[in-house]
């Protein structure tokens, strides 16, 4: 286990390795193969921290061959934050989504969603067609506005491991998965977002030991609670389009554990730009097949229904 001093010393190396990645161009999504049905529910627009309008995102989903698509706004938080939606943006977002549902009826099914953070008020689960439940923060220290974000940057990860956990990455993982487990207590949150988000930067600079018994116990305890609550787990390609990873969340061993539990899964891009709405969907599908999955689950406007991976 790396100590605090060692983690701090890693910072310059991390910045050197990742520095050019921050401005990397998004990977372009692949075209749909073989006429298969596709859906993306995790996509952010200019109503929170996205770069494209909802209509631009919907048009991109149409161009990618999708039969349905959801645009998800980040839930407002009870403290200042740079990426969450402001409370006053929710009503205009819902109004725009109603307009798009009508405008694109018969061409693509359009859904209004929310990515609900476990630190947000549960009222933000109510006015949407569906909800993705996620954990982004580690509740350490007394001021929620100063809670570290697990997916901010490699240097932030170095700092919170050193300063908040004295270099104990397993303790940080236990804290994260305890937060994510709270999604099980939110019935309106049907989907679990990026299950192991804290591993975002681990391909080039390993911060977390996923083989550690403590790490695995924390992850599996959260998984069991979420599976028991009937949640759908997303296979999220967002870190691929941002240049941080070459494989989706969650890690393969987690997918294998989900398969053993007969968990439901869906594929999503966590896109923040119209160019990435279907990034690496084919790769995610092949990974699921390799892990033994035969079905993915798609939202039909009322509930999640099965779709065969192989047509």
Where are these regions (language model features)?
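Extreme N-terminal basic, low-complexity initiation segments
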Residues: 1-13
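An N-terminally biased module of ancient metal coordination in phosphate/nucleic-acid-related enzymes
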Residues: 11-13, 33-118, 199-214, 262, ...
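Conserved, mostly hydrophobic/aromatic
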Residues: 42, 61, 131, 194, ...
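Extended substrate/RNA-proximal surfaces in nucleic-acid metabolism proteins
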Residues: 83, 89-228
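Mid-to-C-terminal alpha-helical segments outside catalytic/metal-binding sites
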Residues: 276-311
